[in-house]
């Protein structure tokens, strides 16, 4: 079952929201806080003993709050600090307007018990690039109820990130 955005707001699962218009019947819109350029290669293994996340360089919005991004991939950080209840998981989908401009947002599953100001991958496929404004709505986060409440919540490296 999908949980409406207004229910998440009432339950305090979204701690910081820019505007009530972010509430959707099937979730909540997440907005753009930061954009980072990847500056080197990361490393992924089986048990995370060799894991190294790519370094990044934060890109700055211009004086009018705009940022032109060329074709390529970027890391983005959201404005909203989100908490996933133990009886839910969440999935992120790009806003349709973002797709229609030739860009996409990718993320992993948001596990029960996760909380933080999450990051995602922004892929700009449009050869002409895209212009994003600070606080642009870029992703819809859809919460689904689990069949049973998780016995233990997410306890990984990214819990509490970007406070």
Show which residues each predicted segment covers.
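DUTPase catalytic domain/fold
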Residues: 1-163
């Amino acid at each position: 079952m999908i949980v409406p955005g207004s229910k998440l707001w009432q339950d305090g699962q979204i701690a910081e929201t820019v505007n009530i218009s972010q509430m959707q019947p099937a979730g909540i819109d997440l907005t753009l806080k930061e954009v980072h350029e990847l500056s080197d290669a990361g490393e992924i293994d089986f048990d995370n003993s060799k894991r190294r996340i790519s370094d990044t360089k934060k890109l700055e919005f211009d004086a009018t709050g705009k940022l032109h991004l060329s074709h390529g991939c970027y890391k983005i950080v959201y404005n909203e600090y989100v908490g996933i209840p133990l009886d839910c998981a969440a999935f992120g989908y790009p806003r349709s307007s973002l797709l229609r401009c030739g860009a996409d947002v990718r993320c992993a599953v948001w596990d029960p018990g996760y909380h933080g100001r999450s990051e995602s991958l922004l892929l700009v496929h449009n050869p002409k690039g895209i212009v994003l404004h600070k606080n642009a709505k870029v992703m819809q986060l859809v919460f689904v109820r689990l069949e049973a409440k998780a016995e233990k919540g997410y306890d990984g490296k990214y819990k509490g990130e970007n406070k």
